[in-house]
Amino acid sequence: MKILVTGATGKVGQCFIRRLLSDQRYTQATVRALCHNRTLEEQDRLEVVRGSIADRKVVAMAVEDVTHVVHLATCKETPEEVMDVTVKGMFWLLEECRQSKGFERFILVGGDAAMGHFVYPHPIPVTETQKHSAYEGCYALSKVLEEVMLEQYYVQYDFDGCCLRAPWIMEKDDFKYSMSFGEDVFGGPRWSELVGAEDAQKHQKNSTVPIMLDPQGKPVQRNFVHVEDLVAAILLAIQHPKAKQELFNICMDEPVDYGNVAKHLLKTRGLPSVSVDTSFRSTWLDNTKAKFLLGWRPQYDMARLVDESYDYKRSEDDPRKIWYPG
């Protein structure tokens, strides 16, 4: 088994490679990492190919002799690059894989942006049968296009693939920084822009916890997944017979309720909180299908996600750095 990993230097790619190479189920597996802006050090069972996924020659070289692809390469809100990576790059991957005699399975890690994330109201849990609904911008559109391209290869060529649709992927101290009123905030929303500079400075100083409210004034429920839980699902899907041509929501059992986060942090750390009005809506991704067909179970709930993030201490050689906008 030889697995090509695109986006190998990201949080999911590095975690996947680390766990695969130490997994007793995959002692015979080797990894080829396709790297572009950043790279990895080669080691036993890990080789590196450099180049852009938008270049068919690079993709052909990367796919040669591989049995599986774990496709993680993506773009955020970068219109100048997103179609080269999402459409052209994935198209070249799919074309090379379908024409390879030894190829077995293509794993795509998609995103809940394809379902509108928390932008649109979802009156019932979001399952894998719900229609796509991208919100404004190129990133959400790219998530829809990825899923549709893979689905159509099933129809056109009886292609063996699987899509694992993930919400916001957390590791280390990500969640803590997603709650920051400062310029160091991770992702969105940017709380400082919602409350104003003066209040934001005060909240940042006091480590105040934002409670995101929907238009009706209720705390928003938002979906997350820890990188370790997502990687566990990838490791299952690579060989699982019931994963062929299937789409799975890979997320926590329940979305994170911002009101409950505030209560938890008040109880465990004595942190104050403040309500923040937004236009965002609660969404509940349903992960029942992955549990039923793959036997997958998430190990992170709200308390563990929050506690590990707030407890996390970075070493000097692991500075916090954001590699993409959004």
Regions found by a protein language model. Give the residues of each.
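NAD(P)H-binding glycine-rich loop region in Rossmannoid oxidoreductase-like domains
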Residues: 40-42, 50-88
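Amphipathic terminal alpha-helices
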Residues: 302-326
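Glycine/proline-rich active-site loop of Rossmann-fold NAD(P)-dependent oxidoreductases
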Residues: 156-159, 171-195, 236-248, 271
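N-terminal Rossmann NAD(P)H-binding glycine-rich loop of SDR-like oxidoreductase domains
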Residues: 3-26
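Conserved C-terminal active-site "lid" loop/helix of NAD(P)H-dependent oxidoreductases
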Residues: 227, 277-297, 318-320
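Conserved Rossmann-fold NAD(P)-dependent oxidoreductase catalytic core, especially the SDR/UDP-sugar
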Residues: 92-137
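Catalytic helix-loop patch of NAD(P)-dependent Rossmann-fold dehydrogenases
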Residues: 121-161
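Mid/C-terminal beta-alpha module of Rossmann-like enzyme folds, strongest
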Residues: 221, 229-281, 287
